[in-house]
């Protein structure tokens, strides 16, 4: 049984990315769907779709690579806020990942969004992960 669905999702993406798999299957939750939507908008994955099997919902993420040598788009993906140690930031202290080259995914009162969008709206929240 998985206690941290976000860490499980990020680990599955990281492992599939390391061996250059095209598709990775992730248990579907509202949070994982919101994170997948952000990854698609920011260009880290090609696409994602949901399907249901035996009343369990799953996400299929299509990972993205570039060039003939299939260079990875996602260089690093790491969990920041964990169940044992939550990390919060207000709008003034939102993290800048790799001087703006990467993104931080933030869970706010207005939903899950990137650090750039949260800063433009002037809201803070829980820092879920960094991706670059």
UniProtKB/Swiss-Prot annotation:
Write out the GO MF terms: rRNA binding; structural constituent of ribosome
Write the record's keywords in alphabetical order, separated by commas.
Chloroplast, Plastid, Ribonucleoprotein, Ribosomal protein, RNA-binding, rRNA-binding
GO cellular component assignments = chloroplast; ribonucleoprotein complex; ribosome
Q: Which domain of life is it from?
A: Eukaryota
The subcellular localization recorded is:
Plastid, Chloroplast
For this protein, the record's Gene3D superfamilies field holds: 3.30.1370.30, 3.30.1490.10
Q: Which GO terms describe its biological process?
A: translation
Its subunit composition reads: Part of the 30S ribosomal subunit.
Protein's job = One of the primary rRNA binding proteins, it binds directly to 16S rRNA central domain where it helps coordinate assembly of the platform of the 30S subunit.
Protein family per UniProt: Belongs to the universal ribosomal protein uS8 family.
- State the PANTHER family in the record: 40S RIBOSOMAL PROTEIN S15A
Kindly provide the name given to this protein in its UniProt entry. Answer: Small ribosomal subunit protein uS8c
Q: Which organism is it from?
A: Thalassiosira pseudonana
Q: What is the lineage of its organism?
A: Eukaryota, Sar, Stramenopiles, Ochrophyta, Bacillariophyta
Gene encoding the protein: rps8
